[in-house]
Amino acid sequence: MIDFDGYRPNVGIVICNSKGQVLWAKRYGQNSWQFPQGGINDNESAEQAMYRELFEEVGLSPKDVKILYISKHWLRYKLPKRLLRYDSKPVCIGQKQRWFLLQLVSDEKNINMQSSKSPEFDGWRWVSFWYPVRQVVSFKKEVYRKAMKEFASVLFDGAKENLLSSKSNESDLKTHHTTKKSTFLTKHSKKHFHKSRG
């Protein structure tokens, strides 16, 4: 479903833990990281799409999370010209997203990137709150900045973060290796990385 302006309705999902860290997912077979996201189908609400994508991409159900906040407005980004598919009609020029901030209320071992037949991700880790804004692919940076700034008012009682001067603490990143049924910790360069295996 693409709107009259050429944007595809989409949901973005930020999952935080009790430490205020957020789940950062590695795209399948790539060295590219992002938050879980996905399109909204016809006759589907944004919340319904969020829960569907949450299960398909992360393996979590509604009972595993609590909705803390939903972005007030649609946030848009345009796709680079190299990613546009001119052979499809209408042409999708970008995404308009409704963002959800979720609290993980169950054990992180329930996270399963292999719950779908065509997984979007093959690994994940916990990172500091602002880390994704600096690390995401360039054409998504502004949307991430806006979403996280809005979410910060919820998590940090309106405390303002300086995105330009703040530096991520790499030693605080968590890395784990995961299988479909189990999670085990491994230490490597003081990081914890969750790697999904089929």
From Swiss-Prot:
Its cofactor is a divalent metal cation. A motif (Nudix box) lies at residues 38-59. InterPro entries: Nudix_hydrolase, NUDIX_hydrolase-like_dom_sf, NUDIX_hydrolase_CS, NUDIX_hydrolase_dom, RppH. It comes from the Bacteria. Its EC number is 3.6.1.-. GO terms for biological process: mRNA catabolic process. Keywords: Hydrolase. PANTHER family: M7GPPPN-MRNA HYDROLASE (PTHR23114:SF17). Belongs to the Nudix hydrolase family. RppH subfamily. Accelerates the degradation of transcripts by removing pyrophosphate from the 5'-end of triphosphorylated RNA, leading to a more labile monophosphorylated state that can stimulate subsequent ribonuclease cleavage. This is RNA pyrophosphohydrolase. It comes from Pasteurella multocida (strain Pm70). The lineage of its organism: Bacteria, Pseudomonadati, Pseudomonadota, Gammaproteobacteria, Pasteurellales.
